Design a protein with these regions (language model features):
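Extracellular "leader-to-stem" segments immediately downstream of a signal peptide or signal-anchor
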Residues: 1-115, 122-123, 129-133, 137-246, ...
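Single conserved hydrophobic/aromatic residue that forms the stacking wall/gate
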Residues: 272-282
Length: 282
């Protein structure tokens, strides 16, 4: 049997197994995968996710002609329901829930997860912290507002290689310091829902505000502006992202749809140990 590395990432109820593509594989190669020797599934990808598993339980996953790996699901987390006391967030797509959601995030301990049932939860910028989890149920949408003032105060960030103050992103983890290591770690963002930003409307509003702030600078540096794509390029560097991860370690994002960032959907700065990209809506 060819020796090809297998690895896995688990939650309480799911396990995703990854393997390296064998040298003799091609685009038509189909892999046979089984859990504890049970019914086999087939995939043409080099990963597979098992669902509806039992928390805190060991399993053996076999990828035939590749190898086997023993895995263990994590213990079930205590759920902090954002719609219940003392948070009472409203998923109507109209009520601004920033304060309530931030409190739920702040209260989330290492064995907890902030839980969003189905609904559209309008919010401004939210701060993540080490050792926490966020779960979005199917049809749950964490919806960023389109008002730039909901993303203040600005934070130190980097845009196209230039460090500067930028609007906060919808989700923010860590503080940027290119001279130091990780200052935020062990965050899990997962589920079946969607994280959606303020999109083009928010981006244009942020740019308009910054153009006014930089009016004199842009006028005095017309030659520099002329080298840019257009006169909105320099002001556009203040835009927040959908998810901003700065100086973070061991971040996992899985199962979610990410869409409509005012700039990039996921911006990773000075990071290590990032796993499982999620679905990006184009």
């Amino acid at each position: 049997m060819e020796s090809v590395l297998l690895s896995a990432r688990c939650t309480a109820n799911t396990a995703t197994v990854f393997w390296n593509k064998p040298e003799n594989a091609n685009a038509d190669t189909v892999y046979e995968v089984s859990l504890d020797g049970g019914h086999s599934v087939h995939t043409n990808r080099t990963h597979y996710t098992f669902t509806e598993l039992i928390p805190n339980t060991e399993y053996c996953v076999t990828v035939y002609n590749i190898g086997s790996i023993r895995i263990c699901t994590s213990p079930a987390r205590h759920r902090i329901y954002v719609t219940e006391e003392p948070y009472n967030a409203v998923g109507d797509g109209k009520t601004l829930n920033t304060a309530a959601l931030q409190q739920a995030f702040t209260d989330c301990g290492p064995n907890d997860e902030v839980y969003f049932p189905a609904g559209i939860y309008l919010t401004g910028a939210l701060d993540l912290h080490s050792c926490m989890a966020v779960y979005l149920e199917k049809d749950a949408v964490l919806q960023g507002s389109s008002d730039p003032t909901d993303y203040l105060p600005r934070i130190w960030s980097r845009f196209e290689g230039t460090e500067q103050e930028c609007y906060r992103s919808l989700l923010n983890a860590g503080q940027l310091d290119h001279t130091a290591g990780a200052n935020c770690e062990n965050i899990l963002l997962y589920g079946k829902g969607t994280i959606s930003g303020g999109g083009h409307v928010l981006a244009e509003r942020m740019i308009d505000i910054e153009r006014e702030n930089l009016r004199e600078y842009l006028a005095q540096n017309a030659a520099l502006v002329a080298t840019c794509e257009n006169d909105r390029t320099i002001p556009g560097r203040v835009r927040g992202r959908l998810i901003n991860l700065s100086n973070c370690s061991r971040i996992r994002i899985t199962g979610l749809t990410l869409q409509n960032g005012a700039a990039w959907n996921v911006h990773m700065l000075s990071l290590i140990h990032i796993s499982e990209p999620t679905r990006l809506a184009l």
